[in-house]
Amino acid sequence: MEKLTVLILVATVLLTIQVLGQSDRDKHLKRRPKQYATKRLSARMRGHRQCTGAGYECEETPECCPNLTCKCSGSPLCTRYSCQA
């Protein structure tokens, strides 16, 4: 009888853990579309962003126009960065 009680208790705990894990996963999936919608709205509110063209100085890659990256140009000490293909 004691073994049966322990077995039922263990089964209940395992089932509870499974149900809680499933509900957390569902909440995460529901939250994801809202995050993307927030990012899209934020981008629209900022408007069209001017990008830095090839050969012009930059500080980081996101400011460069598409297909360009902010790379060191010139001396081995890397004192000047510019947008390059």
Swiss-Prot record:
Q: Does the keyword Repeat apply?
A: no
- Pfam families listed in its UniProt record: Conotoxin
A cellular component annotation (GO) from this entry: extracellular region
InterPro entries membership: Conotoxin
Question: Where does the record say this protein resides?
Answer: Secreted
Per the record, the domain of life is Eukaryota
Position of the signal peptide: 1-23
Give GO terms: molecular function aspect only. Answer: ion channel inhibitor activity; toxin activity
**What is this protein identified as?**
Conotoxin Mi15a
PTM notes: Contains 4 disulfide bonds.
What is the predominant subcellular site recorded for this chain?
A: secreted
What's written under domain? Answer: The cysteine framework is XV (C-C-CC-C-C-C-C).
Write the record's keywords in alphabetical order, separated by commas. Answer: Disulfide bond, Pyrrolidone carboxylic acid, Secreted, Signal, Toxin
Chain residues in the propeptide: 24-49
What are the Pyrrolidone carboxylic acid sites (modified residues) in this protein? 50
Presence of the UniProt keyword RNA-binding in the record: no
